[in-house]
Amino acid sequence: MEIKELQDIIQQNGVVGAGGAGFPTYMKLTDKANTILMNCAECEPLLKLHRQLLEKHAYEIMKTFHMIQETVGASEAIIGIKKSYVQTINALNQHIEEFPGMRLHLLDEVYPMGDEVVLIYEATGRVVRPGGLPIEQGVAVFNVETVYNVYRAVEEKQPVTDKYVSVVAEVSDPVTVRVPLGCTLEEVVAQAGNTTVKDPVYFVGGPMMGRIGNGSDPVTKTTNAILVLPKDHLIVAKKQRTSSIDLKRAASICCQCNTCTDLCPRHNLGHPIDPAKFMRAAANQDFRDLNPYIDASFCSSCGVCEMYSCPQSLAPRSLLADMKGGLRKAGIRPPQGVQPKPVQESREYRKVPEERLMARLGLTKYDKDAPLHEDLVQVKKVKILLSQHIGAPAQAI
């Protein structure tokens, strides 16, 4: 199949990244990619969707991944998967010899392994420059559900009209279900039995980078999980704090320990983001050196600094996000052509173990099986948002 033909099929069937920002998948198909990489790292704690889907549909997904490899002419296809996903690895190994040029790369159980910049370095040794795209290093990254959606578009002529979503935490029966796009979060949560706390909060996405949602919010193409949490949970409290309070707390109790920078995944890959310098400058309203503010553009918002590193429970990630938003509104673009410094020699010792992260966040008790149910959940009506991805909104037909 030619690249243009596959691009047209993918675009016409509405396939975008099934997580993150929802980058249009057809735009990743280019003959500049000498390596394609499938992301099965489940970036966030408690998420199990991708390993479940890849185990259940291993052959179909691998076949499609190989087809993408041949279409773009990539010399190598890598499946990045955490070494603890034993059942999924076994399912892949049953078919791996059928696909020349494809290999598994086993990953450590650390966060944020699913960040594509981190994943690319782990799997290939290449460093994507600050503000750059993976294709600049000859790599195109796809997550598991996205590849499965390409399979359904090519083989079954099926557009993306449904989504796999995990429902976990304070529910009686944690589950991963297939639901129509546009159904409400409440309808999805109902598939997991009863909520087990009064006045639950729906946290959409993972605990590190997710957001607080309303029960009436619609499921979109990037909705991966709903965490049902008590209203007084640590994660909920952190999300509900205001920037003005965060800034005052930084000015009064930051101890200048530098741990937020020491553990920053992007900083350790040589990117110029430096949360400690930013917090010091912002807390003291110090504008003599603008670099800490400008370099906020290179923050990935992974949340390690805010949710794990800081012994004072400050909020570097939230303040950096506000700064990025302010720079965009002011028309200030990230510096172009910035090259990374050498990767930190101590990077291996600065990784965040996912098990320890879950304990720090008070999530360990929620780490339970959430079985995959593939029968499509039936609902009476849906609300389809036209903008479910990066770029121009879709058009109704």
Please provide the spans of the model-predicted regions:
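Gly-rich Lys/Arg/Thr-decorated short loops/hinges at beta-loop-alpha junctions or inter-strand turns
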Residues: M38-H50, V171
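Ubiquitin-like/PB1-type beta-grasp interaction modules and other compact soluble beta-rich domains
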Residues: V165-E170, T196-P230
